From Swiss-Prot:
The chain crosses the membrane at residues 4-25, 34-55, 70-91, 95-117, 122-149, 154-182, 191-236. Photophobic photoreceptor responsible for the negative phototaxis. Activates the sensory rhodopsin II transducer (HTR-II) in response to blue light. The modification N6-(retinylidene)lysine is found at K206. Pfam families: Bac_rhodopsin. This is Sensory rhodopsin-2. Keywords: Cell membrane, Chromophore, Membrane, Photoreceptor protein, Receptor, Retinal protein, Sensory transduction, Transmembrane, Transmembrane helix. PROSITE patterns: BACTERIAL_OPSIN_1, BACTERIAL_OPSIN_RET. The keyword Membrane applies. Interacts with HTR-II. One of its GO terms (biological process) is phototransduction. GO terms for cellular component: plasma membrane. Residues 26-33, 92-94, 150-153 are cytoplasmic. Gene3D superfamilies: Rhodopsin 7-helix transmembrane proteins.
Length: 236
């Protein structure tokens, strides 16, 4: 358990550092984007609380002979919808598609948790439902939301949307693999290894997502200012 605590502590430090960087980045992005940028700060900010609790030994229950970290699922229930909400806002998606996207992502986590605390074979059925719901998330991100992005954004902004979308989708696809191989599934991956992998994924997906968006938003802001200068000169 000492090893697991170490991984949680490292995860906490990673989320703290990432939140600090993103909080500073708030002052660097264009004012018109700051409202949605707050979502990027909130994502690792919420994870700080979750990892602090897990590092201190709180937030887990025993189910079917293995530990289930309830706090981790609460973290995901709150943060992963924020990731897809940011993508929908960036793309200028409709309210209907945005709500569908956020709800489907939240339900994916709910069914993943339900599967983790339920004996097999029901656990696998619940896991499959969660997987199907996540398939709906992927469909919306690559279809409806992508169409909205292409119709409303500049080429550079569309590229940012695609980068962030592919980033989270690819990394999020690793989580169900860990679930299946870990204690909740077939048990081929020990708890320490599964914890290490999940901590790494959490820090990369939360902080990495935010940093990629931050750097792109700074560049877009600088490009906008540069484009305005010739106009101002011409007006003079």
């Amino acid at each position: 358990m000492a090893t697991i605590t170490t991984w949680f502590t490292l995860g906490l430090l990673g989320e703290l550092l990432g939140t600090a960087v993103l909080a500073y980045g708030y002052t660097l992005v264009p004012e018109e984007t700051r409202k949605r940028y707050l979502l990027l700060i909130a994502i690792p900010g919420i994870a700080i609380v979750a990892y602090a609790l897990m590092a201190l030994g709180f937030g887990s229950i025993q189910s079917e002979g293995h530990a289930v970290y309830v706090v981790r699922y609460v973290d995901w229930l709150l943060t992963t919808p924020l990731n897809v909400w940011f993508l929908a806002l960036l793309a200028g998606a409709s309210r209907e598609d945005t709500v569908k996207l956020v709800v489907l992502q939240a339900l994916t986590i709910v069914f993943g948790f339900a599967g983790a605390v339920t004996p097999s074979p029901v656990s696998y059925a619940l896991f499959a439902v969660g997987g199907a719901l996540f398939g709906g998330v992927i469909y919306l991100l690559y279809r409806n939301i992508a169409v909205a992005a292409k119709s409303t954004l500049s080429d550079i902004e569309v590229s940012l949307y695609r980068t962030l979308r592919n980033f989270v989708v690819v990394l999020w696809l690793v989580y169900p693999v860990v679930w299946l191989l870990g204690a909740a599934g077939v048990g081929l991956m020990d708890v320490e290894t599964a914890t290490l992998v999940v901590v790494y994924l959490d820090v990369v997906t939360k902080v990495g997502f935010g940093v990629i968006a931050l750097l792109a938003m700074i560049d877009l802001g600088s490009a906008g200012e540069t484009a305005e200068e010739p106009t101002a000169v011409a007006g003079d």
